[in-house]
């Protein structure tokens, strides 16, 4: 067999597994977060793509910077690195939890920055090699609007 063909197959397999592990982290985290919050609390989530889909499947509402109206006690979920990963600067929040993807040989080929394997540009390849955790999800409690007196 041709070395190039075998190498391409192995690389494709490793990237596919890494992408699957990335999606699995989002899927499990969305369910875990929703299960950990009382049903009477609204959970808001920012982000796009697979994370957005899993968040909606678990009853989270999409958070929009300029139009979402939060109540004290609501929970916000922000997956780091996705577009829309920001909140209004006038919100007072507290960190409730921080989740991150466990690393291992199957996550070494990381296709999970911004849009991962679905987006690239010159100098920014669609995947990287990394032994560090590349996914972090912040769970925040909403305390109310910031006042100028604080």
Where on the chain are the PLM-derived regions?
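Core SAM-dependent methyltransferase catalytic element
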Residues: 125-150
């Amino acid at each position: 067999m041709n070395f190039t063909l075998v190498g391409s197959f192995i690389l494709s397999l490793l990237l596919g597994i890494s992408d699957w592990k990335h999606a699995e982290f989002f899927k499990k985290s969305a369910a875990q977060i929703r299960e950990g919050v009382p049903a009477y609390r609204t959970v808001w989530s920012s982000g796009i793509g697979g994370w957005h889909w899993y968040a909606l499947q678990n009853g989270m509402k999409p958070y929009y910077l300029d139009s979402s109206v939060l109540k004290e006690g609501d929970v916000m979920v922000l997956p780091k690195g996705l577009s829309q990963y920001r909140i209004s600067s006038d919100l007072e929040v507290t960190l409730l939890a921080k989740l991150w993807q466990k690393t291992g040989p199957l996550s070494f080929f990381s296709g999970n920055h911004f849009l991962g394997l679905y987006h690239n540009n010159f100098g920014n390849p669609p995947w990287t090699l990394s032994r560090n955790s590349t996914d972090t999800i912040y769970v925040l409690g909403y305390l109310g609007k910031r006042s100028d007196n604080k």
